[in-house]
Amino acid sequence: MSPQTETKASVGFKAGVKDYKLTYHTPDYETKDTDILAAFRVTPQPGVPAEEAGAAVAAESSTGTWTTVWTDGLTSLDRYKGRCYHIEPVAGEESQFIAYVAYPLDLFEEGSVTNMFTSIVGNVFGFKALRALRLEDLRIPTAYTKTFQGPPHGIQVERDKLNKYGRPLLGCTIKPKLGLSAKNYGRAVYECLRGGLDFTKDDENVNSQPFMRWRDRFLFCAEAIYKAQAETGEIKGHYLNATAGTCEEMMKRAVFARELGVPIVMHDYLTGGFTANTSLAHYCRDNGLLLHIHRAMHAVIDRQKNHGMHFRVLAKALRMSGGDHIHAGTVVGKLEGEREITLGFVDLLRDDYIEKDRSRGIYFTQDWVSLPGVLPVASGGIHVWHMPALTEIFGDDSVLQFGGGTLGHPWGNAPGAVANRVALEACVQARNEGRDLAREGNEIIRAAAKWSPELAAACEVWKEIKFEFPAMDTL
């Protein structure tokens, strides 16, 4: 280590302000297997050199502050400081660069996403020397990964619980999202489940409002689940949203769901918070409940290309905190999501080992070792004509969720569910026979519609519906 970057208590305390780069920019540093690595997109203020801006990010997200303090001499900053070890330009952006920062593992509490984010995406994002700052990716070392429980159950255990294999799972968000009474809500759930869906879902903003208190909703939905199971012979579920104003109330709702014997509950992990989410995930594993995660508020954090945090980081954090499903965009529907980037973080959710691949936005190789995987949920503006593309893009280990694409069917909820189930089964069969879903998708759907009047009606209603806007999230 060069004399410039080494911090020695023996030289005595010298008050004053010095450039961050003298201590925190260390281009010769060799990263350790135990370091947490971060890739930041940095937009400095005019006149701030890249080395100084990158070093400032490393400093302000680890041990540094704006001036020298005498207590620096009471510890070893070389052991604990973050280091900006590499800087690279951003193609097509003269004012931006990627700063790579390494953090010693001792800076973070074991098993706490909350603590990790408090440092890495804390006050540094308001630093005046930066015009904008975005966390593009994190490398979580194996040593830190092993301190997390992760998803309550994971993909294989969920399939075993549901006894459903070889195809994506089908879901539906009950609409209108607000305003239904508990009994009418339960009726809508029943109609969808008996028609062929595997799951129905509370909308993310359904908690416990005056028009429908949570306990009433839970009871009527449980009744709908059991009735649909008896009629179809299949295991069914409804994502009962346990999100609440306090952790205690959230846990009370999860306990009641377990007492009803339902298979799955739901949480809004960003608005609810990582501490609450991790607590709920631990409860779900201990009590046999699956946990569906909604990402409400994510676009506030991840949609701007130059500031905030990319969703792949939020996806990694969710896998650590715990969840069996998480919404991940659709590529083809009404919500944001470019194909290669979406598939990049979908792999980060599902797979054990993911190689670095900058073409898909993956900055670091990630080894999850034995942490269970998470099912990505495709939801938002999708309908039967999208089924071939969704099946081809997301594969079997996914949940395809049609809200308006089920309840908007001209004949009602159950026929809407039938249409989606028939379309899915047709696509899976065609794929298994070796047909090209991307090229022959429409033909496959039309052929299935000839013997399914429910699917034929759905095809007619949504034949002209498209959401063709350019994606914001591009490389």
Swiss-Prot record:
Modified how: The disulfide bond which can form in the large chain dimeric partners within the hexadecamer appears to be associated with oxidative stress and protein turnover.
Entries under CDD domains matching the protein: RuBisCO_large_I
Keywords annotated in UniProt: Acetylation, Calvin cycle, Carbon dioxide fixation, Chloroplast, Disulfide bond, Lyase, Magnesium, Metal-binding, Methylation, Monooxygenase, Oxidoreductase, Photorespiration, Photosynthesis, Plastid
Positions marked as site (Transition state stabilizer): K334
Residues with N-acetylproline modification: P3
EC top class named in words: lyase
Catalysis: reaction(s): 2 (2R)-3-phosphoglycerate + 2 H(+) = D-ribulose 1,5-bisphosphate + CO2 + H2O; D-ribulose 1,5-bisphosphate + O2 = 2-phosphoglycolate + (2R)-3-phosphoglycerate + 2 H(+)
Residues found modified as N6,N6,N6-trimethyllysine: K14
Keyword Isomerase: no
Keyword Metal-binding assigned: yes
One of the record's GO cellular component terms: chloroplast
UniProt cross-references to Pfam families, sorted A to Z: RuBisCO_large, RuBisCO_large_N
EC number(s) on file: 4.1.1.39
Cofactors demanded by this protein: Mg(2+)
Entry GO MF terms: magnesium ion binding; monooxygenase activity; ribulose-bisphosphate carboxylase activity
Record: active site: K175, H294
Residues annotated as binding substrate: N123, T173, K177, R295, H327, S379
Alphabetical list of InterPro entries matching this protein: RuBisCO, RuBisCo_large_chain_AS, RuBisCO_lsu_C, RuBisCO_lsu_C_sf, RuBisCO_lsu_fd_N, RuBisCO_lsu_N_sf, RuBisCO_lsuI
Cofactor binding description: Binds 1 Mg(2+) ion per subunit.
HAMAP family: RuBisCO_L_type1 (MF_01338)
Family as reported in the entry's similarity comment: Belongs to the RuBisCO large chain family. Type I subfamily.
Protein function: RuBisCO catalyzes two reactions: the carboxylation of D-ribulose 1,5-bisphosphate, the primary event in carbon dioxide fixation, as well as the oxidative fragmentation of the pentose substrate in the photorespiration process. Both reactions occur simultaneously and in competition at the same active site.
Note: The basic functional RuBisCO is composed of a large chain homodimer in a 'head-to-tail' conformation. In form I RuBisCO this homodimer is arranged in a barrel-like tetramer with the small subunits forming a tetrameric 'cap' on each end of the 'barrel'.
Subunit text: Heterohexadecamer of 8 large chains and 8 small chains; disulfide-linked. The disulfide link is formed within the large subunit homodimers.
Protein name: Ribulose bisphosphate carboxylase large chain
Organism: Carpinus caroliniana
Gene: rbcL
